[in-house]
Amino acid sequence: MLTLFSQRHARSGARVLISATQMVTDAMEQDYVLIVEPNLTGHRWRYAEWIMQACADAGYPCMLVTECANEDHRLARQITAANRPDQQIAFVDPEERPRNRLPDPNEYWRFHRYFKRVHTIITRMQSIRLVVVPYVDYFFYSLPFLGSPFGKTPWIGITMRSTFHHHKVGIKAPDRPVVNAIKALLFKRAIRTTGLRTLLTIDPTLPEWSARSPSKHGAAIAYVADPFPDEHAENPVLARERLGLDPGQRYLLVYGAITERKGIYELVHALTRLEHAPTLIVAGEQDAGTRHFMRNHVRSLNPAPLVLDAFISNDMERDLFSACDAVWLGYKGHYGMSGVLVQAYRFGKPVIATEDGLIGWFSRRCELGPILSDLSSASIGRAITETMTSWPHTAQAMPSAREDLLSRHTLGQFKQTLLQQMA
């Protein structure tokens, strides 16, 4: 029987909900792994889920902490419904700022305060052996000034947005020499933070850059391949039948959390100017701005697009990647890795990719499809035409770089790497 405990801490004003069972006492006597992720939008809830799965595989009891607004999120409901004493969830909101306290100088400080608050509240109720932060970029650059938010508790963080080194390793990114130099210095200080056991990164070039000038007494820096759920291509004819798609049409897929940064606006404008355009599939939950844009422009597209503005199930995701002819990765201002790129590779689909960041680096190095030098309608149109007529290229021996890099991007490999650092 599931029980919900609601506790209001008088001093902090925190509302904490912890899902538990009648048999929870024995489990709670063990030392838990604490996973803190305040935001369950986009891909972040997936990382929290995968880390919990890894803990379960290894027999580590764990607790996910997120903000109260996420009580109705599918992951929160899933954990609650499973009713497992070794898989707990708690909800903690940021502390309301007292009127007499100055505001935090930046977002890094604000998030550091939140993570420290979570650790303080949870450790009053439960012994914690290790903290795992799926997205350490929330507060990473505050560490040289504020220290660890977790006291003496050892912890592991995953960085997804460390881009200051990209110019040094041949990745196209904004040229900000002063900002990059400052962040490089802060990075070297941050990895010496007390309690930080390992900094994992989804960028394979960061450990390489760090090894050039290793920091004394710093945490280990290790590459963890950005995973995507382990799926394999279905028969495209059957996938199209299930989706109600035309077996003779060409389809270009835009997948994931659909925002302006996906380059969706530029893509739609380019498609309206393109003769013999493929049918656009936009699959994933849209933000308000994108939803408004699509509503106003959907009639200008010919053929009419398929718009799935909703959470995409694993089965539908598999059908979408199986049925499409190419995948759009012409993102804007995104310099990190993309799970969508991994999935396109896994399903053998060419991509139309930005030249920026890790998406461009992987796409060029692994020969995944046309690379966009810009997001003009002309460039996009040429790339779409090339993709639909010339890709994938005639089968050749797979480049060793492609096999070595992208074959590691599996959920199993992610869990294995994580558990090696948690042991």
Regions found by a protein language model. Give the residues of each.
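Glycosyltransferase donor-sugar binding loop
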Residues: C68-N70, Y255, T279-M294, A310
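Conserved donor-binding/catalytic core segment of Leloir-type glycosyltransferases
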Residues: L245-K262, V268-L271, I281
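A short, active-site helix/loop in glycosyltransferases that binds the activated sugar's phosphate group
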Residues: H167-K168, P177-I221, F228
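Short N-terminal targeting/anchoring amphipathic segment
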Residues: P103-F111, V118-Y141, P154-G157
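A charged, aromatic-enriched C-terminal amphipathic alpha-helix characteristic of glycosyltransferases
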Residues: L375-S379, T389-M422
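A short helix/loop element that forms part of the nucleotide-sugar donor recognition site in Leloir-type
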Residues: H232-L245, H393
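Short hydrophobic beta-strand element within catalytic cores of glycosyltransferases
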Residues: A326-V327, P350-E355
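Nucleotide-activated donor-binding/catalytic signature segment of Leloir-type glycosyltransferases, i.e.
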Residues: H292-D319
